[in-house]
Amino acid sequence: MTELFTTVYGRGLVDEFKEYVHRPYVVATMADLWPRFADSFDDGHVGPLLVRSMERSEVERDVAALPEVNAVIGLGGGQALDTAKYIAWKRRVPLFQVPTAMSVNAAFAQRAAVRMDGIVRYVGWAVPEAVYVDFDLIRSAPTELNRSGVGDILCYHTAHWDWRMARDSGQMEARWPYDERLVEEARVAFDRVVENAAAIHDVSDEGVRALMESLRWGGAAFHNSGWNPRHIEGAEHFVFYALEYLTGRPFIHGQPVTLGVLLMSALQENRPEWIREVADRVGVSYRPEQMGLTWDDVAAALRILPEHVQRAGLWYTVASQRPINEEFIARTREWLQA
């Protein structure tokens, strides 16, 4: 359970790739990022591959259109890093990952998150040679991106409640029996974020290390526990999946996940005020209007949540156990707008 990706912390790390990466190589990144980094690469580069969509059929087309490459560099947020994993998996080439913000744990996970008919699926297998965390590069990202990464750790708060509830109500999956050891390991990563909330808010070197080390643990935890998601993901992620399904638009991953943590902790009656206070200390944006959503969007996602859980084949959580009625929707709206 302790195998984690090699992670290198430093400065000026992107400029070094041309000195050692296998040639020819491709950089998977985003259109808005590429102009900033284009001069860091040399004529051994045959890209870039600019990510347009995570719909699997489109990712497949993009990968098929690539020329021969001997390495891939993921440079960006979750979509760029997941696309790089997909390329490494399909082409069987070495992978190097460079997250440009602390927005998600994608750099530290083996599978790529793609969409199939609007439903999230985790596919493939790719382990990077290393993940490169450049302090100055991370700090140059918008603060809302860097703070949002706590969502992938704060979700342990609701996930652990869901797992215990499933055990106690006889709804626990046979393949994922409750394991206090896994919960305790996750708690270490969770507590690190809570204890360093102010440093993460400030994106100090200390804060970058604290959040990235927790994301490093969490990203690998799915595989390291035998493909068990129970200690790292629960109903809070299902809220995000339902929002994505309904709206058909991308999000900064940790923002809707954090909203899901608050909503589902309220449904669980699981210290919602306390976990909200932690989110506020970090400064993560979780209100719908900060994500370009309306409360009508959130309400619609909550209403279809049990149905979406069933459609997507997700596990038993508070979203299946407790009804979400109009009174709950109105009450949580008032609470989060206060």
Language model: regions and residue ranges:
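A short, small-residue-rich loop immediately preceding and capping a beta-strand
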Residues: 66-87, 91-102
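Solvent-exposed alpha-helices and their adjacent loops that cap or buttress functional pockets
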Residues: 19-20, 64-67, 121-126, 130, ...
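C-terminal charged capping/lid subdomain of soluble metabolic enzymes
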Residues: 153, 162, 166, 170-172, ...
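A glycine/threonine-rich phosphate-anchoring loop and its flanking beta-alpha core
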Residues: 91-189
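Short glycine/serine/threonine-rich phosphate/pyrophosphate-binding segments
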Residues: 34-36, 79-86, 104-107, 232
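Active-site segments that bind and position negatively charged phosphate/pyrophosphate groups
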Residues: 180-289, 293
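ATP/NTP phosphate-donor binding region
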Residues: 1-71
